[in-house]
Amino acid sequence: MGKNKLGFPLTYSKLYEYYDLLSTNQDEIDRKNRFIDKILSQYKVKTVLDFTCGTGAQLFGLKKLGYQVTGVDLSPFLLKIAREKSRQKKLEVELIEGDVRETQVGSFDATITIFNAIGHLTKTDFETSIRNVHKNLVNGGLYVFDIFNLNAMTDDAIKNLAMDVKVITGNTKIYHNQNSEINRENGRLTSYDCFTIEKEYDEPKVLKDEFTLQIYTAKELRKILVRNRFEVLGQYEINGSKLLEQETMNMLTVAKKS
């Protein structure tokens, strides 16, 4: 992970083949993509760099809508799935293994980092990534990203993040339990995962791990973006409704390169 000290979920590496089963919800993806499309259309965006593309949740959705898209991700495992999806869907996209903090791909009308991706970066690395995003945008280009809202992380909200799910794929059963806790002083949300993998004729396999997300208030994000030569155009709930700074759990920020 290099400079990143917060860690990643096991579904980014050891359990990558189960990422889409355990970490994605198509209805949620479609809602996000509709709002992202609305923003991009408003600013007449044609080219999009998804700097944390994962298995392609936004990448392929935007490609189908007619955008020229390029995907970058730090995980070779998730990119492997994205490449297979590209073949299956017959959607040709450029996919690059790289790091939002330092990879330079070109000049795009917009860059996106979705699904709390920036939370895996320390505050210092987040600012480094913003400066690199700036380098990958045309003049006036957009940066669109989401992250949990620190102000909305009440005790009840943390409890509601808990997961206890079971999924079945072929002859494999996967049980995923997750609980989280927050340090409100430093804005770090730590999640504790337990995965139980049951394959036919094999002994159950149990994997435990933890990872931390650095989260922010809306005000913090505005200050950081301005400090790194971005103009904040708007902040919203992830579904496109008005941001409530003390209540919105997952906020989406739209900024313009200045």
Residues of each region from the PLM?
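Class I SAM-dependent methyltransferase SAM/SAH-binding core
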Residues: 56-102
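A short acidic, Gly/Pro-enriched loop at the edge of an enzyme's catalytic core
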Residues: 101-110
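A short glycine-rich, Lys/Arg-flanked "PGG" loop and its adjoining helix->strand segment in the class I
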Residues: 127-139
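Conserved beta-strand signature within the Rossmann-like core of class I S-adenosyl-L-methionine
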Residues: 140-147
